[in-house]
Amino acid sequence: MVKFSREYEASIIPEWKAAFVDYKRLKKLIKRIKVTRRDDSFAAANAAAAADHLLPPPPAEKEAGGYGFSILDPVRAIAARFSAGQQPSASEDEECPDRGELVRSTDKHEREFMERADEELEKVNAFYTGQEAELLARGDALLEQLRILADVKRILADHAAARRARGLARSRSMPPPPPSSSPPSSVHGSSGRYLLSGLSSPQSMSDGSLELQQAQVSEGAAVADEVMAALERNGVSFVGLAGKKDGKTKDGSGKGRGGGGGGGGGVLQLPATVRIDIPATSPGRAALKVWEELVNVLRKDGADPAAAFVHRKKIQHAEKNIRDAFMALYRGLELLKKFSSLNVKAFTKILKKFVKVSEQQRATDLFSEKVKRSPFSSSDKVLQLADEVECIFMKHFTGNDRKVAMKYLKPQQPRNTHMITFLVGLFTGTFVSLFIIYAILAHVSGIFTSTGNSAYMEIVYHVFSMFALISLHIFLYGCNLFMWKNTRINHNFIFDFSSNTALTHRDAFLMSASIMCTVVAALVINLFLKNAGVAYANALPGALLLLSTGVLFCPFDIFYRSTRYCFMRVMRNIIFSPFYKVLMADFFMADQLTSQIPLLRHMEFTACYFMAGSFRTHPYETCTSGQQYKHLAYVISFLPYFWRALQCLRRYLEEGHDINQLANAGKYVSAMVAAAVRFKYAATPTPFWVWMVIISSSGATIYQLYWDFVKDWGFLNPKSKNRWLRNELILKNKSIYYVSMMLNLALRLAWTESVMKIHIGKVESRLLDFSLASLEIIRRGHWNFYRLENEHLNNVGKFRAVKTVPLPFRELETD
C-alpha cells in the first residue's frame, strides 16, 4: 500500500506546490513529539529505578540471617513498607524539576505543531480565496462576453433575414435568373453558420452598382446602430464616440465633423467600428487588424458608415476565443477543486497522526472543526460555477451534446499500453542486429577504406546521416520527456500541447527506434544491391526519403497524425516568423533547428541529388562543387538563426519593447556572423580569416554561454542560496548542475575543430563531421531539460497553472 505522503506528493499541482499544506514538515514535527515522549518515558523509568536503588533494605532481610523467622515479621514488614512510602518523597522532589522540564518540552513541541498547522491553514485559505475570487470574476466576465456575442449574432441574423426577405420580394418582381446563378443558401438552424452568413467582408464593400452600395451603406448604418446599442447595454465603450446621431460633437456644437456651414446640420457619423479585440496571431488576423485600423482612420475622417460592418471572420474568432476561455476557466475550476480535496485530506491525515502521538483529543477536535469551517473546505462556489460552465458550454458550443462538451472540458488522457513498450524493444533489437550485419558487410566490401568507393560514401553519407541525426534528436527528446515526467515538470502546459498531441517518452523512443531500424535495413539492402550490380541501386535512399515524406504528410489518422500536424504548424510559424505570434513551442523548436544545421545541409544535398536525377549518372559532384550550391549552403547555414532573430523582434514588439528580446536577437546575429566567417574561411583558408574565425566564434560562444547559463537556465546568481546556481532547484544533487555547466561549455567549443585543419582521409572526415553534429544534438538535448526546468520554476513562482485566453470584447475609452 502506498503511503499517503508519497501519494500526496505525486498528486499535488506542481505550479501550486508552495500553496499546499507542507505535509512533510508537519509530519517531522509529529515525529519530534513522538521522540520527545519516548525520551520522557525512558527518563521516568530511569528515575524510578534510581529511586528504588536509594531505598534501604527491609529490616526483615537484615535480621533474617541473625534471628531467623519470627511471628513479629509481618509487623516489621508493615513498618518497613510505611517507611519506604515516606522516604522516596525526597528523591521524587529531587527528580521533579527534570520531569517538569521534560513535560514542558513535550508541550512546547505540541504547541509548535499546532501553531505551524494554523499557519498552514491560513496559507491554504488565503490562496484558495484569492483563486476563487479570480475565477468567479473571470466567470462573470465570460458570461458578459457570451451575452454580447449572442446579441451581436441575433441582430445580424435579424438583418440577414430582412435582407433575404427583401431579396425574395425583389426577385418576384424581376424575371427569373439565368441557370448559372447560384441558389440561395439554406438555413441551418442549430449550427450557427447561418447567423454569420449575412455579414459582409472588407472586399464586398466596393462591389456592385452605386445603388447597391448606397443600400449597403444604409443597411450597414442600421446594423452598426443596433450592434453598438446592444454592446453599450452590456457596458462596452468604443473609440470615436464624438459623432452621435444628434450631430453633436464634444464641444457641444451642433455641427458634425464633416458638416458645412449652411443647410441643415452635420453629416451623420456613427461611432467607430465595433472593437472586437482579436490577437494578431496569424497573417489573416494581422491583416484583419490592419484593416480595422485603416477603417478607424477613415471613420475619423468622415468615411461612409459601411466601414462599420462587423466581419464574419471577427465574429468567428471571437466565438472561438470565448470557447477557449471557457475551457481554460473550467480547467482552473477543476484544479481548484483538486486543491481543496487534497488539502482537506492532508489535514485529516496529519491530525489523526497528531492525536495518536499527543493524545490531545480536544485540541484536535477543535482544529478539525476549524478546518471544516474554512473556505477551502466549506465553500461551494467553485462547484456551482463548474456546473454552470458545463451547462453554458453544452448549450452554446456543442448543441446540447453533453458527451461532446465533456470531450472539450475534460479531455481524456491516452491510455498507456504495453504494446508500445514491446514495439520499442522489438525495433531496438532489430536495429542492433541489422547494424551488426551492415558493419560486417561494409568491412568485407571495403567501402570505408581509403581505396573504397568514394561515390558510395558521398551519396550514402548525406542521405542516411540525415535520418540518423533526426533519430538521435527524437531519442534525446524522449529522454527529456522521461526526465520531465519524473521531476514533475509540466511540459505539456508550458508548450500548450493538448492530450492527443503530446507524446510520451515511450512514443518518442518508438519513433526513434523505428526510424533507425528502417534506415539500417535500407543500408543493408542498398549494399546488397550494389554488390549484385543492380542498376539504380542508389535510388533506394531516394525511395526512403519519399516514404518518410509521405508518412509526414499522411492525412489518415495513423502514425501520430495530430503530432505530425502540430509539428508542421510549428514549422510554418517558424518559417513565417514575423507573421505569427511566437509561442513557447515555436521558439523552442527554432532553437532545436539551430543545432541541426548539418541536417539541413544534408537535406540540401539530398534534394539536389534526387531532384536533378543525378542518381542515374552518379555525378555527385554536381551537388557539391557548383557555385549556386555553395551560395545555397551559405544561406542554409544561418537560416535557423535568422528565423530565431525574427522571432525575438516579434516578441520585442509584442511584449512592450522588452530590451531582453533585442539582446537575445543579438545573440543569434552574432552566431550568423560567426557562421558566415567560417564559411568564408572554408573557401579561402588564409591566416587573416583564421583570426577572424577565432575572434567571431569566440565572441559568439561567450555570448551564447552567458545566455545559456544566466537567461535560459537561471544560473550564475551570486546571491543564490545555492552557490552560483538559482534559489530553486528540482534535482537534489547540486553537483549535477555544475557538471552540466562544464559539459555545455565543452560542447560549445566544438567549432575549434574547424580551425585545426586535421589532416585525415575523406571517410574519416565524414565520420568526424557526423560525430560533431551528433555532439551538438546531444548538447541541445542536455540544454532542453534545464531550459524547461527554469520555465517551470517561473510558472511555480507565479502560481500559473492555467493559460490566460484574451477576451474579444473589451471596454475601450472614448476619444
UniProtKB/Swiss-Prot annotation:
It is a multi-pass membrane protein. Residues 255-266 have a biased composition (Gly residues). Belongs to the SYG1 (TC 2.A.94) family. Induction: Not induced by Pi deficiency in roots. InterPro entries: EXS_C, PHO1, PHO1_SPX, SPX_dom. It comes from the Eukaryota. Its main location: membrane. The lineage of its organism: Eukaryota, Viridiplantae, Streptophyta, Embryophyta, Tracheophyta. Residues 183-201 have a biased composition (Low complexity). One of its GO terms (cellular component) is trans-Golgi network. Involved in the transfer of inorganic phosphate (Pi) from roots to shoots. It is found in: Cell membrane. This is Phosphate transporter PHO1-2. Residues 202-213 have a biased composition (Polar residues). Residues 1-421, 480-508, 560-686, 752-815 are cytoplasmic. Disruption phenotype: Strong decrease in root and shoot biomass and Pi content. 25-fold reduction in Pi transfer from roots to shoots. The gene is PHO1-2. Specifically expressed in roots. Keywords: Cell membrane, Membrane, Phosphate transport, Transmembrane, Transmembrane helix, Transport. Residues 83-108, 166-213, 242-266 are annotated as: Disordered. GO terms for biological process: cellular response to phosphate starvation; intracellular phosphate ion homeostasis; phosphate ion transport; polyphosphate biosynthetic process.
